[in-house]
C-alpha cells in the first residue's frame, strides 16, 4: 500500500464532547500500522460557518497525516488557541479548553501520541496529572499528598 493511502476498511472511533453548550463529534481512523490516518469533525448544521471551519480543520489535519507530517507538529499550533466556544467540557480527561481546536489537539495528542511526545507539549492524562501532583507534593513534611505542618506554641 502506498504511503498515505488508507485501507478501504479501517478501524477508528468517534468521540462526542460538549464544549460550553456546543456538541462536537471527532472521528479518528487509523492506518493498518495503528497510527492515526485521518480525522473528521462535525459541529453544528451542515452549511454553517462552524461546520465549514471544523471540516476545513479536519481536512488540513488529514492532509498533513497523509503526507507523513508528525502528529505532534500538527497539534502543537492548536494547543491554547482561544475563541468561542470555550470553557468546560464533559470530557473528564480534558475538563476545560480555550476552544474547539484546543480540545481537538489535546484529544488527538492523548489518544495517539506516546507519553514523551505529549509531555513535551504539556499534555497529560488525568492519571498522569495526579501522579505529577503527588510527586511534586512528596517532599519532607508531606504525607499522602497533604502538607503536615508542626506548629510550636509558646514564645513569639
Predicted regions located by residue number:
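Catalytic or ion-coupling anion/metal-binding cores of large enzyme and transporter domains
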Residues: 1-29, 88-156
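Short beta-alpha connecting loops at secondary-structure transitions
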Residues: 41-45, 85-94
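Generic secondary-structure signature for well-ordered alpha-helical cores
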Residues: 62, 66, 80-84, 106-114
Amino acid at each position: 500500500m502506498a504511503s498515505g493511502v488508507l485501507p478501504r476498511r479501517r478501524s477508528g472511533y468517534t468521540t462526542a464532547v460538549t464544549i460550553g453548550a456546543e456538541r462536537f463529534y471527532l472521528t479518528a481512523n487509523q492506518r493498518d500500522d495503528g497510527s492515526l490516518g485521518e480525522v473528521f469533525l462535525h459541529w453544528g448544521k451542515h452549511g454553517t460557518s462552524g461546520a465549514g471551519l471544523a471540516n476545513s480543520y479536519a481536512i488540513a489535519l488529514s492532509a498533513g497525516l497523509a503526507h507523513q507530517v508528525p502528529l505532534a507538529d500538527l497539534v502543537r499550533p492548536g494547543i491554547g488557541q482561544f475563541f468561542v466556544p470555550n470553557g468546560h467540557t464533559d470530557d473528564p480527561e480534558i475538563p476545560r479548553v480555550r476552544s474547539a481546536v484546543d480540545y481537538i489537539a489535546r484529544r488527538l495528542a492523548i489518544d495517539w501520541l506516546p507519553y514523551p511526545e505529549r509531555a513535551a507539549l504539556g499534555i497529560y492524562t488525568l492519571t498522569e496529572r495526579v501522579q505529577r501532583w503527588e510527586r511534586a507534593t512528596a517532599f519532607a513534611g508531606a504525607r499522602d499528598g497533604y502538607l503536615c505542618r508542626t506548629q510550636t506554641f509558646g514564645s513569639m
